[in-house]
Every structure is written in C-alpha cells, then in structure tokens.
C-alpha cells in the first residue's frame, strides 16, 4: 500500500510525473486534494480558493481566462468523479497559497490557521490510511513525514527550465511566465515557512530530490517507481 508524495515548484512537471508513476504502479492519482477536501471540511467553496490564483495581479486578466477554461474543462470531465480521485481535477492550475499567508484579501485569508491545518492533516492521513496513492501537493511530505510505507520526492529545476515549461504548456509570453514562476514560488515558500517552518528545497524533507534540469519526465517517473518498490518488497 505505498503512498508517494511529489512536491516541487511550478514548471518542474510534478503533475505529469505523478500521473506517469500512478499509471506504472497502478496507484490512485491525487492532485488538488488538499484544497478540495479542506475546503469541504471548513465549509468554503473550493472555487473560492482556486480563484485566488487570479491575485497574481500583473497579468490577472489572462490568468482569469485560463482559470475559467480549466474550471469548465474540469466540470465537463469530472462530473462523475469521486471527491478524492475525480478526473479533471488534476487540470486545475496550481494553488498559490497567497491568501493563507496573508498576501491576498479573499475568503481563504479569513480561514483560521488551526482549522485549516487540521483539515489538511485529516485529508492527508485519510489518504495514507487508504494507501495506493500518488499525492501531488505542497505540504504533504510534512504532514506524512514519519508515515510508514511512504516515499517523499522533491523536484527542482533551473528558472529557465520552469519558464520554458510554462511558455510551452500555457502559451505565456516569456515575461509573463517568469513573473508567474517567481510569484508562485515566493507564495509557496511563505506558506511552508508559516505552517511548517521549512523551506521547500530542503533535502532533509524528502527521501530523494530530482533535478528536472538534468532528466526528462519519463526518466524521473521510472526512478520514482523503482524507489517505491522498496516500500512493497
């Protein structure tokens, strides 16, 4: 019953790699789980949390159109999906955590920290109890730091690689992609520092770290799948 967490900044390919690993090992693929279920537990619409993506303001309108498109696609493809593993939810854009660290001004900022973290912990531990999952989510490796049969993987990549990934995937101009990468990473760092007093690139929080500037996604997925074999052998 292995559980694999994959964490990394936007543009490292965590979602793609996670999907590959899940397919290879026949595991459930879990992406926007924490915000989806945490929002349900605390009674906040998940759309409200996702919408804060638009608060990366310098190109808000373009991101707003992107968010709307992804939400429509998710609704179409995930209409009959399960709350944890619904198809289509993995296509939603990455969360910024800006409201949760006080950078934004929306509903998420008003959530009590203790309530939010308790919800995050419950969801993560429920998933771990079920087993057989690849979890894409910032903070999952901290919540399940000492959990049995769990492999924590960190991803990193040079700025130019991450910027190019966004340009190719989201059709951003280079300047837009660069701003997006920088602001989301800063928000991610602030979030982890606030709630876990940790930096996302600290190697001690993972079983392994992979430099996506040095390998492709297929190789990374194969390395992770091989390492996960130790959890079941």
Set out the residue ranges of the language-model regions.
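Glycine-rich phosphate-binding P-loop
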Residues: 5-19
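Short beta-strand-centered segment that lines the nucleotide-binding/catalytic pocket of NTP-utilizing
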Residues: 28-40
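ATP-dependent small-molecule kinase phosphotransfer cores
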Residues: 39-132
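Small-molecule kinase domains that catalyze NTP-dependent phosphoryl transfer to phosphate-bearing small molecules
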Residues: 57, 61-65, 79, 173-217
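Short, amphipathic alpha-helical "lid/cap" segments that border enzyme active or binding sites
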Residues: 121, 217-225
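Conserved phosphate-donor/acceptor-positioning beta-strand/loop module used by diverse small-molecule
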Residues: 146-170, 174-182
């Amino acid at each position: 019953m292995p559980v694999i967490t994959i964490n990394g900044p936007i543009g490292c390919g965590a979602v793609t790699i996670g999907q590959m690993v899940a397919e290879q090992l026949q595991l459930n693929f879990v992406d926007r789980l924490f915000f989806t279920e945490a929002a349900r537990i605390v009674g906040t619409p998940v759309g409200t949390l996702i919408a804060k993506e638009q608060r990366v303001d310098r190109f808000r309108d373009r991101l707003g159109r992107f968010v709307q498109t992804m939400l429509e696609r998710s609704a179409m493809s995930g209409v009959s999906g399960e709350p944890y593993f619904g198809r289509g939810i993995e296509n939603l854009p990455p969360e910024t955590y800006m409201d949760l660290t006080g950078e934004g001004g929306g509903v998420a900022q008003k959530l009590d920290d203790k309530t939010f973290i308790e919800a995050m912990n419950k969801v993560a531990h429920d998933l771990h109890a079920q087993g057989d999952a690849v979890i894409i989510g910032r903070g999952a490796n901290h919540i399940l730091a000492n959990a049995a049969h769990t492999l924590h993987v960190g991803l990193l990549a040079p700025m130019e690689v991450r910027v190019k990934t966004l340009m190719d995937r989201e059709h951003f101009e280079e300047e837009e992609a660069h701003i997006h990468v920088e602001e989301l990473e800063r928000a991610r760092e602030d979030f982890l520092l606030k709630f876990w007093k940790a930096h996302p690139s600290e190697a001690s929080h993972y079983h392994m770290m992979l430099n996506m500037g040095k390998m492709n996604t297929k190789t990374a997925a194969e390395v992770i799948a091989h390492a996960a074999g130790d959890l079941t052998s």
